[in-house]
Amino acid sequence: MANASEPGGGGSGGGAEAAALGLRLATLSLLLCVSLAGNVLFALLIVRERSLHRAPYYLLLDLCLADGLRALACLPAVMLAARRAAAAAGTPPGALGCKLLAFLAALFCFHAAFLLLGVGVTRYLAIAHHRFYAERLAGWPCAAMLVCAAWALALAAAFPPVLDGGGADDEDAPCALEQRPDGAPGALGFLLLLAAVVGATHLVYLRLLFFIHDRRKMRPARLVPAVSHDWTFHGPGATGQAAANWTAGFGRGPTPPALVGIRPAGPGRGARRLLVLEEFKTEKRLCKMFYAITLLFLLLWGPYVVASYLRVLVRPGAVPQAYLTASVWLTFAQAGINPVVCFLFNRELRDCFRAQFPCCQSPQATQATLPCDLKGIGL
């Protein structure tokens, strides 16, 4: 009776393992397809749409391409390693392959962290110092410099082999980030660097939030009469609108007394130096989108960074296998979540997507946009 029951138990166990392997491979394939489709679609949208040829979208283009390359390089290797581990005579992945994949994972992780820090700084300058941002940082040279700096810093942070490939016992992440036993101080230093970069990014956005909140405080109006000898108004009671119009290049007549020695802006590139309300709303929407990407990066990479800290400071077996598996899968999901966040938080991207792909727009939405188009041409 005992001999008769053993094959049945082995068959049921083998079926459960096969089902778990199939579910794991299907999930990895879905993540790979979603990441490649979303990131490539947004990259093509940014390249084809001329209204998106601005510095923030160039940085978003680099982030999308990096996420797509990470999914294309790492997820198929994890799928292959999972199949090898589940095979009866499966061989563990080679040490060189694991080191290469661990280097790529660290490279893309540090690249995203450094790039998001640069994006946070540019977002702060775009709102707090808009004139300096519009004159110096709004073009593609600044975006190219930030992209090159992010890749160079990421390469410098990921190249030393203190972050090695994991062992063959981790079926879900056989080639994920793991410190070497003899490289614990170096691994701790790089983990501290990653935490410092992510923390600095959130501090920049916190400073931006305080800046916006301070500018929204209501102050009581002081009704002091303004001084006027011609069309210009100056003095304590003046609102400054005439001087602002004259400085921006829209005023006519003599120079206001308070602006003697200042030349008005001409019709060239420096004519639009004031942050009007619509531009301010656009910059705020971009800030919300990039901060959502930064926050998701922290939430999805945070559990694995905590596990890495425990492995470095305590011992490799101090982290439960279930927690390690869940944290690794969260890092896999980060490669395909950014296009979804961009589509949800950026109305300009949604409008450009509907314009480039009219087949994705419903007839009701097309009819709803018709009066707006007629209103835009003056009918």
Swiss-Prot record:
KW Transmembrane helix (keyword) present: yes
Disulfides per UniProt: 98-175
Intervals, Cytoplasmic compartment: 48-58, 122-142, 207-289, 346-379
Compartments reported by the entry: Cell membrane
Gene Ontology biological-process entries: positive regulation of insulin secretion involved in cellular response to glucose stimulus; positive regulation of phospholipase C-activating G protein-coupled receptor signaling pathway
Membrane association type: Multi-pass membrane protein
Keyword Cell membrane: yes
Intervals, Extracellular compartment: 1-26, 80-100, 164-185, 311-324
Keyword annotations of the record: Cell membrane, Disulfide bond, G-protein coupled receptor, Glycoprotein, Membrane, Receptor, Transducer, Transmembrane, Transmembrane helix
Membrane spanning residue stretches: 27-47, 59-79, 101-121, 143-163, 186-206, 290-310, 325-345
GO cellular component term, pick one: plasma membrane
One Pfam family linked to the record: 7tm_1
MF term (GO), any: G protein-coupled receptor activity
PROSITE patterns, per database record: G_PROTEIN_RECEP_F1_2
Glycosylation sites: 3
Function: Orphan receptor. Possible candidate for amine-like G-protein coupled receptor.
Family, as annotated: Belongs to the G-protein coupled receptor 1 family.
Protein name in the entry: Probable G-protein coupled receptor 27
Organismal lineage: Eukaryota, Metazoa, Chordata, Craniata, Vertebrata
